[in-house]
Amino acid sequence: MAKETFYITTPIYYPSGNLHIGHAYSTVAGDVIARYKRMQGYDVRYLTGTDEHGQKIQEKAQKAGKTEIEYLDEMIAGIKQLWAKLEISNDDFIRTTEERHKHVVEQVFERLLKQGDIYLGEYEGWYSVPDETYYTESQLVDPQYENGKIIGGKSPDSGHEVELVKEESYFFNISKYTDRLLEFYDQNPDFIQPPSRKNEMINNFIKPGLADLAVSRTSFNWGVHVPSNPKHVVYVWIDALVNYISALGYLSDDESLFNKYWPADIHLMAKEIVRFHSIIWPILLMALDLPLPKKVFAHGWILMKDGKMSKSKGNVVDPNILIDRYGLDATRYYLMRELPFGSDGVFTPEAFVERTNFDLANDLGNLVNRTISMVNKYFDGELPAYQGPLHELDEEMEAMALETVKSYTESMESLQFSVALSTVWKFISRTNKYIDETTPWVLAKDDSQKDMLGNVMAHLVENIRYAAVLLRPFLTHAPKEIFEQLNINNPQFMEFSSLEQYGVLNESIMVTGQPKPIFPRLDSEAEIAYIKESMQPPATKEEKEEIPSKPQIDIKDFDKVEIKAATIIDAEHVKKSDKLLKIQVDLDSEQRQIVSGIAKFYTPDDIIGKKVAVVTNLKPAKLMGQKSEGMILSAEKDGVLTLVSLPSAIPNGAVIK
């Protein structure tokens, strides 16, 4: 029997700059849905990609001295690298510069032109280049006036400046579909989510009257050209929106994917582009006589305490930095737990560190560690088989486990990720309390309570298994580590379907003898400071580095310092010191002993054989009773010392100038 299909898409991202945490938010959310649906047994297709045409890309490429495709290839490589780092499980990545996409855009445009839904006219309006969007005078924010006439303003979506544009343009006659669109909304009340977005679309855009949409430009060349009138480039919102069907092979020689997966189950996007997905896209599909997607979900923005993320404000969060320092699971967990999906949320370094320490390290990590340690201590690592509830606390835990799955499922189906995770953490917290209530350390002292003790352990492991399965869509590493440490190898016990009945571990298993912390605790103060520093714009960092920390010297002063190349031939720790190493270096004409404060960063074995730079004309000194005849140069950053290593080709004794 064929699996039920599920097709989910993210917005396709505009690669005019590096992506930030907000872009990762959309894509991680899509990944969570895709993993959840796969876990439920669906045949899932998850699409993401890039929107690569338009005036801004053309200008960026020219400024960089590259062709558009050269510029784009570099940007897309970075985006794909970030998605790989986030372990996004997309099934396809569509680029609007690909032939499979351009071919569909051309055919769609010509078809709409032929059937009269697109017509040629002249457009005059206010245009934002970064947003690639036209606005009417009434939509502008902070309009500027001269002699009572508007001469400028800003985009209501982004705040970017707009410019008055007048040019020949093709128009899409969307106004004639107004009644049909409203009828579709009535028949499909859950089409636009959250409901507040639907009210916004109707009251702000549809009721005032839909104006026909300009769908081509002649002022730039980078895009899909209209086949029957090549001086026109297809406007981005026709070009970009079609990606959802071009990626499935619509109008190609092989439409099997399109026939299998269309219509989409969910289009995910940030709230600023919901208008295009809930008004223009449905009308375009109506004009093509194609089924409409089942749901459009517009999530909120990730804001900072001082408003939207902006490089000039120094508040942009790079997901790469969070992943590299704190791990992927901590990053994904924070995004899905701290920020209510559908509403705006505020990113703070304090909340990120707290979620990692309290939720992941304390609640989940300690539960796993305590449980495995007790199984090892009381049963030599062999977990007794589940026997059923032997105590009213057992019955309570089993009932809560099944209720947790039910509540979790309801939240996941409505894309309330933070609520779903909160439900899991209530269960984890209750399981930690179950340990205190059953007092295994007391039961272990009474041989007659051996069965009761074993059943407590079985309930703890089963509860942890439940939590690990429910966390699989969110965390890509921790559930695997939990299953490994519990020695749960049967894939069946890792599936969502295994949660329908409590107590499937009806045979004894050997847990790991050495539980490993899954989430190390963070130094709150240090890590909050680190995240804040990483958010500063590059210019600020450069300015800090340019501030001289010591008085300037002239060349005569510098000439007094003698620096030579040397090879470290031996090293050992200085007794009674955790900072110092006693090092022997070969300077060709002589050997010297140098005492260096690098023991916290290097072992003796790490440095033997290294070619280093040595200041050879320092006055000899004694450190911890050891004579030191020089200084090995090292670099220091954020309290970390790194030896200055020289190429091996430089001979010992060579003077460095």
Curated annotation (Swiss-Prot):
Domain tRNA-binding positions: 557-657
Locus of motif 'KMSKS' region: 308-312
Disulfide bonds: none
Compartment list: Cytoplasm
A GO term, aspect molecular function: tRNA binding
Family matches, as PROSITE patterns: AA_TRNA_LIGASE_I, TRBD
Principal place of residence: cytoplasm
Keyword terms of this UniProt record: Aminoacyl-tRNA synthetase, ATP-binding, Cytoplasm, Ligase, Nucleotide-binding, Protein biosynthesis, RNA-binding, tRNA-binding
GO biological process terms, semicolon-separated: methionyl-tRNA aminoacylation
A single cellular component GO annotation: cytoplasm
Chain positions of motif 'HIGH' region: 13-23
EC number annotated for this UniProt entry: 6.1.1.10
Catalysed reactions listed for this entry: tRNA(Met) + L-methionine + ATP = L-methionyl-tRNA(Met) + AMP + diphosphate
Pfam families recorded: Anticodon_1, tRNA-synt_1g, tRNA_bind
List of residues binding ATP: 311
Family: Belongs to the class-I aminoacyl-tRNA synthetase family. MetG type 2B subfamily.
Record function comment: Is required not only for elongation of protein synthesis but also for the initiation of all mRNA translation through initiator tRNA(fMet) aminoacylation.
NCBIfam families: metG, metG_C_term, PRK12267.1
Subunit: Homodimer.
Protein's UniProt name: Methionine--tRNA ligase
Organism in which the protein naturally occurs: Staphylococcus aureus (strain COL)
Gene for this chain: metG
